[in-house]
């Protein structure tokens, strides 16, 4: 892709303000970490942000001008801390996370609406005690107590054991669930399940064997509802077009739906070390973005129109794939790069990477502690910084002895997350 079409600057020697978003993004991340450790609350950080903005404005107009950038970086760090403080302390009194322990682990009526596509799981043919189940995340709007219904906020991850009717995004549901706080296993250094759910805004888990009442479909975004309806249609078409094993694999690798995978299939992928093939990640999204851009250019669309159309379709695909965290991250990163082409700006990959990180962390600062988020950005950073160095090292090597470009990218990607 020619440079005027937003080709990334291959050199990483840019200095000064050529990449202004990189120090701002790093400061934002540092602020998130500091607030998580110190727990000062949003008011203190906003006070410092105000001081930094006033100081930067004064330095800009009357000097010393050298203080403008440091004050802006400090201000962005405090904005990151304030965003994290809001995520930690910004819950209202009626939030699910504040529900007293006395109401947990006992049947409690609730109402809410489904905020994402459901995750149905078939019964385990090897274990009669493992019934079919449907799991979905609900934005709880009311809890039922002896005194009556009480308005509530917060999300819960609910599981209905046994057969349940069709559940879709935006559906309002009512049922009696046993709620509990997410539990962490005691394995040292093991997976922190409560923290993982917290990054997704989920405060409680719940389950029931009782029927769940559907109250209608009147919540949520009409656009998302249409995308998820299209996703459900595609899943049904795949089921009807081919046998179960093949359909299950296609649904998992293309649309992110693993509900059709049997326990035997899951175990086979785990035993072979290839389970990651089933996960939709940045590779899928970047290949799609590149293919779409190339297709539109072949159709003689201008670079800006091709990039804009590719952005729309990549965003649509993220929804069709279930809008999981990894897919959304990859879509945001691809769209950020394509946006530079739309704006007719020379795309610098480090700046694009920093901008996407700022957007994601502003929306949900808890993502910074998510291992998937960290690995995604470290691997991408490894590619951005590693490929130019690989090219320079291999410049003097005869062509027949060089490694393929795909292996260069693989080595660079793996070097990013490697411990030093």
Regions found by a protein language model. Give the residues of each.
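Membrane-interface helix/helix-cap signal primarily in integral membrane proteins
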Residues: 2-15, 70-276
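Small-residue packing motifs within transmembrane alpha-helices
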Residues: 21-23, 27, 46, 71-79, ...
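Hydrophobic alpha-helical transmembrane segments in multi-pass membrane proteins
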Residues: 23, 31, 65, 206, ...
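Membrane-interfacial entry segments at the cytosolic side of transmembrane helices
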Residues: 41-47, 61-74, 302-304
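Membrane-embedded alpha-helical segments of integral membrane proteins
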Residues: 16-60, 370-373, 377
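Hydrophobic membrane-targeting signal helices
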Residues: 28, 34, 57-60, 80, ...
């Amino acid at each position: 892709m020619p440079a005027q079409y937003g080709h990334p600057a291959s050199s990483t020697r840019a200095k000064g303000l050529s990449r202004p978003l990189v120090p701002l993004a790093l400061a934002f991340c540092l602020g998130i970490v500091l607030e998580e450790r110190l727990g000062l609350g949003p008011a203190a950080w906003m006070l410092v942000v105000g001081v930094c903005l006033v100081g930067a404005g004064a330095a800009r107009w009357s000097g010393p001008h050298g203080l403008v950038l440091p004050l802006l970086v400090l201000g962005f760090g405090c904005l990151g801390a304030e965003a994290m403080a809001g995520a930690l302390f910004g819950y209202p009194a009626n939030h699910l996370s504040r529900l007293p322990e006395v109401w947990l682990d006992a049947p409690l009526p609730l109402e809410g609406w489904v905020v994402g596509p459901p995750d149905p799981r078939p019964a385990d043919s090897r274990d009669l005690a493992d019934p079919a189940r449907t799991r979905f995340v609900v934005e709880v709007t009311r809890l039922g107590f002896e005194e009556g219904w009480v308005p509530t906020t917060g999300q819960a991850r609910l599981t209905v054991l046994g057969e349940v009717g069709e559940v879709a995004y935006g559906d309002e549901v009512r049922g009696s669930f046993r709620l509990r706080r997410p539990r962490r296993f005691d394995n040292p250094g093991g997976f922190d399940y409560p923290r993982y759910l917290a990054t997704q805004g989920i405060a409680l888990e719940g389950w029931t064997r009782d029927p769940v009442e559907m109250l209608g479909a009147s919540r949520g975004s009409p656009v998302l509802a249409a995308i998820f309806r299209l996703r459900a249609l595609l899943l049904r078409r795949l089921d009807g077009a081919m046998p179960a094993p093949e359909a299950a694999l296609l649904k998992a690798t293309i649309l992110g739906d693993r509900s059709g995978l049997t326990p035997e299939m899951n175990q086979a992928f785990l035993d072979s070390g290839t389970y990651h093939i089933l996960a939709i990640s940045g590779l899928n999204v970047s290949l799609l973005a590149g293919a779409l851009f190339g297709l539109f250019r072949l159709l003689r669309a201008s670079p800006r129109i091709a990039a804009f159309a590719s952005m729309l379709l990549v965003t649509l695909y993220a929804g069709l794939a279930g809008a999981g965290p990894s897919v959304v991250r990859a879509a945001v990163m691809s769209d950020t790069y394509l946006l530079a082409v739309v704006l007719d700006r020379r795309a610098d990959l480090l700046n694009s990477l920093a901008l996407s990180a700022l957007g994601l962390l502003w929306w949900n600062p808890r993502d910074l502690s998510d291992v998937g988020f960290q690995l995604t950005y470290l691997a991408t950073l490894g590619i951005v910084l590693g490929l130019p160095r690989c090219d320079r090292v291999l410049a003097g090597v005869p062509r027949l002895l060089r490694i393929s470009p795909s292996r260069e990218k693989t080595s660079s990607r793996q070097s990013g997350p490697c411990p030093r």
